[in-house]
Each structure stands twice: as C-alpha cells, then as structure tokens.
Amino acid sequence: KVYGRCELAAAMKRLGLDNYRGYSLGNWVCAAKYESNFNTHATNRNTDGSTDYGILQINSRWWCNDGKTPGSRNLCHIPCSALLSSDITASVNCAKKIVSDGNGMNAWVAWRNRCKGTDVSVWTRGCRL
C-alpha cells in the first residue's frame, strides 16, 4: 500500500508515534517519505547482505527475521514480512523499539540526511489530526 501523507500521519498518530521519545509526528512522516516514499511494500538490499523492509525500512540484521540474513538478531521478534503489511502496526511497534535503542531517530539514515534539523511540521500541515 502507498499511503497518502495525511493518511499516514493519522495512522501513525493513532498508533502512538506523535512525540514518542520526543519526536513529533512530522519527523516520522518525513522519515517514511524518504525511506520508502510511503510504500509499505518497499524492500532494499544492503551491501552487508541484510535487507530493509517496509514503510520505515527496518533492517533484517538487527530487527526482524527474513530467514536469509546471516547472524540476524530479530530484536523485534517478528518476521520481516510483517513489516510489508498495509497495516503499519508491526512497523510502528518495531520503530518504537529502535528509537528507544540509544541513537533515537539517527538510526534512520534518510531521517538524519533529509529531516533532522529541518522544519518537519510541513509534513503534517493541513492534515486533520
């Protein structure tokens, strides 16, 4: 599923991401835009043999099990396929674990490069939330 901007903002808010660990909703919507272009089915292979999955491009080396990543830790205790669902609950729950891990949203390279330090309120502007 490819989410609309406001549709995704509303879903993320409903699942408790607004100001989770101090990150406003705009940060999460911005991250999703530049990680997956709001597409829940996005997958991208990394040079280390791991794969990033879903709307927030969650990595199989650490966070989920895809059955093909050597030494996978599966810290969210989920199959990576769960992160490709049109229902973003699994992605959001795992993202909460990731952002609580010590580096905050810096865990997402696209957030660090494209969203961090910018006015992320534009990502929720005009949305009925």
Swiss-Prot record:
UniProt-listed SMART domains: LYZ1 (SM00263)
A GO CC term attached to the entry: extracellular region
Primary localisation category: secreted
Top enzyme class: hydrolase
Subcellular location: Secreted
Catalytic activity as recorded in UniProt: Hydrolysis of (1->4)-beta-linkages between N-acetylmuramic acid and N-acetyl-D-glucosamine residues in a peptidoglycan and between N-acetyl-D-glucosamine residues in chitodextrins
Residue ranges of domain C-type lysozyme in the record: 1-129
SUPFAM superfamilies listed in its UniProt record: Lysozyme-like
Cysteine disulfide links: C6-C127, C30-C115, C64-C80, C76-C94
Tagged with keyword Hydrolase: yes
The UniProt record lists the keyword Secreted: yes
Active site (catalytic residues): E35, D52
One record GO biological process: defense response to Gram-positive bacterium
Pfam family membership, one: Lys
EC number: 3.2.1.17
Keywords on record: Antimicrobial, Bacteriolytic enzyme, Disulfide bond, Glycosidase, Hydrolase, Secreted
A GO molecular-function annotation: lysozyme activity
Task performed by this protein: Lysozymes have primarily a bacteriolytic function; those in tissues and body fluids are associated with the monocyte-macrophage system and enhance the activity of immunoagents.
Complexes and interactors: Monomer.
Family named by the database record: Belongs to the glycosyl hydrolase 22 family.
General remark: Lysozyme C is capable of both hydrolysis and transglycosylation; it also shows a slight esterase activity. It acts rapidly on both peptide-substituted and unsubstituted peptidoglycan, and slowly on chitin oligosaccharides.
Name listed for the protein in its UniProt record: Lysozyme C
Organism (species): Lophura leucomelanos (Kalij pheasant)
